[in-house]
């Protein structure tokens, strides 16, 4: 008699995904971040559900309801800060996951990669609408500035902005619909995650060597379940330290002030995980140009499979592209720093240089490095 998990209609799906899944024997800890993202999503949905039980999406009471959650609800402060800092951990894992995909050439599994880009965009949208909900100063002005960017779209821009706002400014209607979006989007993300997993299990994972690993596979359980468990413990430890010791370190001080349409904060900036894109947006003096650069800064990820002309899979044995990759990461950190700085010299100039380098590395330098490395291989 075969084991139940292998022939039960429901259990065999779980079995083929998490138990008997053939996995390359040499995947490193950089492959842990997929499961960590799954844990982050579960934490966000659970804490978000409990927050939604006490939150009111009305301009008159939203700010007070968040204060009420922190002061009067049992462990409300913990749930609120787990949710806020959980988003930061989510994005840290997301950036590392995408970075690993770029480094090890996972983008050649194009369906998985493209679903991943859609997931990235959906997560960014979820985080943006969620940032507006506490209805602090930066929530309000962040929503105003970012949604107002859509007015740069020719002909339909202004109508589109008013349609999203539900009026002539960010107000009660905007907050209500943003709450609705923030509630539904994580479930859409969860559905997309299943599609993402479906495609990755069609082809199997890539591995650090970039070679075909069909001849050297091991079952996912117990080897990688234990390995993932260690990653999860480390993630939870870091999140706990963040929540209990530095809960507001990644937030904005302006969000302790209730939203006031008559008073603009000195420097409007989004949450830290959007700063790199915000810096690219600000580095172009033209509104429409800035919006296009902002969109392109994420969609450029879709160009990786098209621009890749290397004979090797991944960067493990490609020192020139490796160097470019780490310059790209350093440049991304510089953009993140610039996004949080005021719009003045020398920050504007640094931002413009970093923005140009961001696109130049991906579109021009990496393909050139690929060709040079191909020629070096031919010589030997």
UniProtKB/Swiss-Prot annotation:
The chain crosses the membrane at residues 33-53, 77-98, 113-133, 178-198, 226-246, 288-308, 320-340, 347-367. A ubiquinone binds at residue 201. One of its GO terms (cellular component) is respiratory chain complex III. It is found in: Mitochondrion inner membrane. Keywords: Electron transport, Heme, Iron, Membrane, Metal-binding, Mitochondrion, Mitochondrion inner membrane, Respiratory chain, Transmembrane, Transmembrane helix, Transport, Ubiquinone. One of its GO terms (biological process) is mitochondrial electron transport, ubiquinol to cytochrome c. Its cofactor is heme b. PROSITE patterns: CYTB_CTER, CYTB_NTER. Heme b b566 binds at residues 97, 196. Binds 2 heme b groups non-covalently. It is a multi-pass membrane protein. Heme b b562 binds at residues 83, 182. It comes from the Eukaryota. One of its GO terms (molecular function) is ubiquinol-cytochrome-c reductase activity. Component of the ubiquinol-cytochrome c reductase complex (complex III or cytochrome b-c1 complex) that is part of the mitochondrial respiratory chain. The b-c1 complex mediates electron transfer from ubiquinol to cytochrome c. Contributes to the generation of a proton gradient across the mitochondrial membrane that is then used for ATP synthesis. The cytochrome bc1 complex contains 11 subunits: 3 respiratory subunits (MT-CYB, CYC1 and UQCRFS1), 2 core proteins (UQCRC1 and UQCRC2) and 6 low-molecular weight proteins (UQCRH/QCR6, UQCRB/QCR7, UQCRQ/QCR8, UQCR10/QCR9, UQCR11/QCR10 and a cleavage product of UQCRFS1). This cytochrome bc1 complex then forms a dimer. Heme 1 (or BL or b562) is low-potential and absorbs at about 562 nm, and heme 2 (or BH or b566) is high-potential and absorbs at about 566 nm. Belongs to the cytochrome b family. PANTHER family: CYTOCHROME B. This is Cytochrome b. The gene is MT-CYB.
